[in-house]
Amino acid sequence: MKWFGRLALLGLVAALSAGGLVSVQLLRSMPKLDGQVKLQGLKAPVQISRDSSDVTHIEGASALDTWRGLGFVHAQERGWQLEFNRRLMRGELSEILGAATLDTDKLMRTLGIIGMAQKQLQGLSPATQAALQAYSEGIQNAWLSGAVRPSPEFKLLGTQAGGPKGQAWSPEDSLGWALMMALDLGGNWGQEFARLSASKVLNHEQLWQLLPPYPGEKPATTVDLPALYAQLGVFAPKDKSAARDTPAPNALAQWSADWVRDVGILEGKGSNNWVVPGSHTVSGKPLLANDPHLALSSPAIWYFAHLKAPAGELPGGHQHPALDVIGATLPGLPFVVLGRTQGVAWGFTNTGPDVQDLYLEQLDATQPGQYRTPTGWAAFEERAETIRVKGQGDVTLQVRSTRHGPVISDVQPQYSQLIDGQRYAVSLRWSALTEDNKTVEAGMLTNWAQTVPELQKAFTDNHSPMQSVVMADTLGHVAYKAVGKVPTRSASNDIRGVAPSPGWLAQYDWTGWLPYAQNPAVDAA
């Protein structure tokens, strides 16, 4: 048995050697946290320090330099997270993970996250565009400075920040990531599809017993959905659920597949925030707490930072006061999302309004490429997308859109297996996919607010996702406000957006937006 002992010894040596190599690689990938780094684009030195509570403090001679500094530290500590998220929203995961993430890429290309982000960027003020540009420069130049070293994920997958082009981040990526957060917190379209699916086998009463608006509530619509869908001939005539030949996914690919399956489902998730006026506290000052519940991830979704800069002027003549804000940032965005300034604090929970509607688009059997509208037949808007797939050739995706939005049944397998694709397609109307979405601009303005009224004004342009915000300032003013855009629907819309509606009937179209002043609010000035 001497050979067994020698083999075991060789195995141990090999394991230790491999472990040593991994350890060396991990150490080499650690960011440089001490000393000085020359960062291109800075107009003056930026001071960066980290305290015992794991809060990163960034102070620049201008707001633009401070945002460059935040981009720098996000790249240092969350480089792979930024790269993965960039690829996710751009539909470029399959380039490094192979065919197992192809469904994810197809969905992202169909939603057109980056294309819409580019349009939304043009509608932002010069000041906000400059802030996003400065932040992107901080990320890009962090990699060029040598202070950021590729983590093992880059090595294992044979890629670099920004992929082949080396563009690690851009302003439209920040807007794209804001849209991704809105998608994650949207929550309604998955429930609509669940009601469509259940309508194939349940009657009206059973459907609402299984899927009520909330447990114990009455049906949200008087329309007999199973009868309506049966009358329209929505469902596929036979089972189309045959297993597809796809490779066994790795961990990242499995996450991607699970995400595509569950996107649009928010049931059971929750957060909490609290604000207590000074009349109920020992100190006589308000107390505010926030506990947002987002998905568990490693690294975490949030990154805590303190941003400081003197008063100044941004492009477009935007005069701003001194910047002094601390709280939770999102890697990918240059502002504190949840936190406080010297004068006011705020916290979010998800409001969960109905901002997504699915539409059944009736197809013209005699004219391929046409769908029915209230005024007749219309051509789909179409564009071709090329997806690079590791280990195989490129995949060309033909994306279709209607007057409501992208056709998601083309890229969601569970949709195409359920409906009769010869007669119908399913499109998505989603509030976030509008060119006037200025959520990121509202985020910038909140970071300068010093009172509750200033904060309420800053949130005026917040669009998606709608959030329930509690606020408190040092003057003792506390308030609650739902901030964001909610679509209005006509009284004749009897389905009320709780299940897929006939897209060719104008009564189911959105009619506008609820004015900001009419959003739910409580003010205890």
Spans of model-derived segments:
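Substrate-recognition/specificity elements adjacent to catalytic centers across diverse enzyme folds
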Residues: 6, 19-287, 292, 298, ...
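Short helix/loop capping segments that flank catalytic or ligand/cofactor-binding pockets
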Residues: 58-59, 67-68, 177-179, 284-285, ...
